[in-house]
A protein has these predicted regions:
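Predominantly long cytosolic amphipathic alpha-helical stalk/bundle segments
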Residues: 46-140, 147, 151-162, 191-249
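Alpha-helical transmembrane segments
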Residues: 24-44, 48, 142, 149, ...
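Conserved functional loop/turn residues at catalytic and ligand-binding sites
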Residues: 63, 141, 176, 180
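Alpha-helical membrane-interface segments at transmembrane helix boundaries
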Residues: 6-16, 113-134, 166-177
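Hydrophobic alpha-helical transmembrane segments of polytopic membrane proteins
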Residues: 175-189
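Hydrophobic side chains within alpha-helical segments
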Residues: 20, 33, 40, 127-129, ...
Length: 249
């Protein structure tokens, strides 16, 4: 025997109908986030698949102008956005390697970090909705179920022994259907949240790896001096001035 949803809707009380409406809104909102997020990440991945090999090749060939041009033209891909932020920060210095200092390298690293934070914030926008829907929809449905069962047994008490099981069956069905709706809303939201979270973690690895590749290129392009820590360089400079290994206070 099938379930007549229209009949159940007609038999529902105002509270149960309100619960169903709330869950319908939650479902529409979460599906909208899923579609928007899927399109956003797919476009970003496609753009990065085109950009990353070209950029890596340009870096390996030390074709700086081409690398900068690629980063500036690709604004959709997550990797291009991160590298574009770093290159935009130090582009005038990159064209003249003799002027690059450790402060410039640090500036490029900070630019990468800032752009990664912005990009990740955009990627994660909406995930909170999926997490909230996935966590609360079953409880919203359970609330409707609880109130439906209360109403069913209240009706049974009013009818007395003459009502029997038939007297409360409609109320029980009304109560349980809200739990089913809650699970139908929550399960896709939880699946989507886990999927997008994993996908964003993978994109973060791609951004981190490629940005490190750029920073390594900048360090190598100005010599091995930047392979040493700032403290080591300051210590050696002080040692050269004082002629000893101790730094005076």
């Amino acid at each position: 025997m099938g379930v007549d949803l229209m009949h159940l809707w007609a038999q529902m009380g105002y509270f149960a109908k309100g619960v169903v409406v709330v869950m319908a809104i939650m479902s529409i909102y979460s599906v909208t986030v899923m579609i928007t997020k899927l399109i956003q990440l797919k476009h970003s991945e496609a753009a990065t698949r085109r950009f990353a090999p070209q950029f890596s090749r340009a870096i390996q060939e030390e074709n700086l102008d081409q690398a900068i041009s690629l980063a500036e033209k690709n604004k959709v891909g997550h990797v291009a956005r991160v590298l574009g932020g770093a290159l935009g920060e130090v582009k005038p210095l990159l064209r003249d390697r003799a002027t690059i200092t450790s402060a410039d390298i640090n500036s490029a690293e900070r630019a990468v970090e800032r752009q990664m934070l912005i990009t990740l914030s955009e990627f994660k926008r909406g995930l909170g909705v999926l997490a909230t829907v996935g966590a609360t929809a079953p409880f919203v449905g359970l609330l409707g179920t609880t109130m439906g069962i209360v109403n069913a047994f209240t009706g049974m008490a009013q009818q007395g022994a003459s009502g029997g099981l038939a007297g409360i069956s409609a109320g029980i069905a009304e109560a349980l259907i809200t739990t089913a709706f809650g699970l139908m809303v929550a399960i896709p939201a939880v699946w989507a949240y886990n999927y997008f979270s994993t996908k964003i973690e993978n994109l973060t690895v791609e951004m981190t790896y490629t940005s490190k590749e750029l920073i390594d290129y900048l360090i190598k392009s100005v010599g091995s001096e930047f392979g040493r820590s700032i403290f080591t360089k300051e210590f050696q400079a002080q040692k050269a001035v004082t002629g000893s290994g101790q730094i005076s206070g």
